[in-house]
Amino acid sequence: PLKFPPSHDDKYDLIILDPPAFAKHRGALRNALKGYTRLNVKGFQRIRKGGILFTFSCSQVVSKEHFRQAVFTAAAQAGRKVRILHQLHQPADHPINIYHPEGEYLKGLVLYVE
């Protein structure tokens, strides 16, 4: 289970969620999306109003759309309004072959949490 370090009010201005790959094959997609949702709910519960949350996925079988949906579902479950400040993707040293779109596996969001 995800554990945050103790603090006086247990709320943070900045949280970075960068887990290992949750799915390495298509059969694990559903559980991976549940995992991303659970992880992000915990992040949204622990961030202060006006905080910034960085959240990432390196799971090849999780599309950008699936990842965004898991994060948006988490925000709704946590009762938080969020705005996307920036969408992140893999850098030029991780080129994507047009014949292998699954090679686009690094993805992230920078979110402002209201």
Question: What are the language-model segments listed below?
Answer:
Residues P1-I16:
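S-adenosyl-L-methionine
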Residues P5-D9, H25-A28, H66, N97:
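Short, well-ordered secondary-structure micro-motifs
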Residues P1, L17-R26, V61, I98:
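Short charge-dense sequence patches
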Residues L2, P6, T37, V41-F44:
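Amphipathic, non-transmembrane alpha-helical secondary structure
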Residues N31-G35, Q45, S59, S63:
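Short amphipathic alpha-helical interaction segments
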Residues I47-K49:
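Helix-to-beta-strand junctions that scaffold the AdoMet/dcAdoMet cofactor pocket
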Residues K11, I52-E114:
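C-terminal catalytic and target-recognition region of SAM-dependent MTase-like enzymes
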Residues Y12-K42:
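Mobile active-site "lid"/loop adjacent to the S-adenosyl-L-methionine
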